[in-house]
A protein has these predicted regions:
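Extracellular, repeat-based ectodomains that mediate carbohydrate processing or recognition
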Residues: 1-269
Length: 269
């Protein structure tokens, strides 16, 4: 929530609010502020935003977002009635969440939170995926941390993209196939080029985020233009071994949407 969007006044703040519906979205509960610490309203690195919820196997509600404190985490164990006294900081987000990537009008590195609800060995695991520039301003990467105890403790960060090229990987998004517990990530990737040519890659993890295998899924690269707003997110879903990443590409300042029809059986192992 913004007191006044784009306001530069120190009197205006941004916060994270929570509301829920018990009747299929017909009515909603009174919004409850769940971020103890706020940010500014400029819609930049010091703004609190990018909240993504995830539901645990026993109805736990988990939320992550980012802002001046870095990547933070909140949770409720009673359906959203009460929350932790304050959000906890999970990671520094190097370069902030509003990243500078050549050829991109605005490159968000906002976090994505998912929970394993499968019947597999990693049921209940929380996974947090985001992009930042820990490797330097010319080396954006996709990262993940995980929790196996409901967000009490978290692993060290692990890099999702396995190229080691010191190039940009950005606009990450992830999903979990709840039939298997496998993790899938989609992101833009420039590992193969020295300019702004951009491919799309998918990474898969079949061991709860310990190891990853990369696959290029775009047929050919495209060259974006920083003069044109390109959107803020990619997306991906996976059900019963069928994986559907979706992304935009750009040619001559015209945007096209793409979806890939991918089967787990056909991916590199």
């Amino acid at each position: 929530q913004f007191d006044a969007y784009n306001s530069k006044s120190k009197e205006d703040s941004s916060f994270i609010m929570f509301s829920k519906s018990n009747d299929q979205s017909l009515t909603w509960s009174e919004p409850l502020r769940i971020s103890k610490h706020g940010g500014d309203c400029i819609d930049d690195d010091n703004t609190v935003e990018g909240a993504v919820p995830a539901i645990g196997p026993n109805g736990e509600i988990y939320v992550t977002w980012t802002g001046p404190m870095g990547l933070v985490f909140q949770k409720s164990l009673d359906g959203g009635s009460t929350w932790m006294e304050s959000e906890i900081v999970l990671q520094e987000q190097f370069g902030g969440w509003s990243l500078e990537v050549p050829g991109i009008y605005r490159a968000n590195g906002l976090p994505i939170l998912k929970c394993d609800l499968s019947n597999g060995p990693n049921q209940g695991n929380l996974y947090l995926n985001w992009c930042d520039q820990k490797g330097g301003e010319d080396n954006t990467d996709s990262w993940i941390i995980k929790s196996t105890d409901g967000g009490v403790t978290w692993s060290d960060r692990i890099r999702v993209n396995q190229d080691g090229s010191n190039k940009h990987q950005f606009f990450t998004w992830m999903t979990i196939d709840q039939s298997s517990g496998y993790l899938y990530f989609v992101y833009y990737d420039r590992r193969n080029y020295d300019d702004t040519q951009t491919d799309v890659y998918l990474s898969a993890s079949r061991d709860g985020g310990k190891t990853f295998v990369d696959t290029k899924i775009s047929e050919k690269p495209f060259i974006p233009s920083a003069e044109m707003f390109f959107g803020d997110y990619l997306n991906i879903d996976a059900v019963d071994g069928q994986i559907r990443p979706i992304w935009p590409s750009m040619k001559d300042k015209k945007i096209k949407l793409h979806v890939a029809l991918i089967s787990e059986k056909g991916l590199k192992k």
